[in-house]
Amino acid sequence: MKISILQPKAFKEKGRRDNQEDFLWPSPEQVTVANRVFILCDGMGGHDNGEVASCTAATALGTYRTAHPAPDGVLTKPMFEAALAVAYDALDKIDTGASKKPGTTLACIVVHRGGVLAAHIGDSRIYQIRKGEGVVFQTKDHSLVNDLLDSGEIKPEEAKNHPKGNVITKCLFVTDDKDRYMTPTITLIRDIKPHDVFMLCTDGVYGMVDNDDLA
């Protein structure tokens, strides 16, 4: 499968936060049609800890994945997981010994000969949007609200403004214990048509729009 990319677009805004904890790889100034790896991380941990965690994880993952292309052009889950291990190693190196460990969400797509590999952890999302059809693929948040939805404890209309809406159940975080690594959900997308758009965004974006607005 040959996939051509139009000029990617990227932007970030601090919004109401004191710090900009979102990190894009490549940066908005560096992204080109030659890129095949796109990463969004939303850090957490207070002060500048979240900012450092998101930058560290995204840079390590993106740099490794770009430097180690799949031999036959088709990326597999184990190949992506190898890059993820590099990101965890990089996070471990920023450990300051503080009791509160910084962490980050992850939304990543890798365009390859077999389609698009989509990986996410936490509540940063990946959307695949198709002209005339709207959203045809959307990642499922690793969050308390989604767990409550799945168990039937709350209804969909209660989810958007739920008081625990910012509680996530998985993230990449600083740890030297490999048994505690949290792994992302990885989806291999092969149903791709001309002019499909892949969008990576944080909760600060999708919290303000509905899927119909993305069509």
Where do the protein language model's features map onto the residues?
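PP2C/PPM-type serine/threonine phosphatase catalytic domain
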Residues: M1-A215
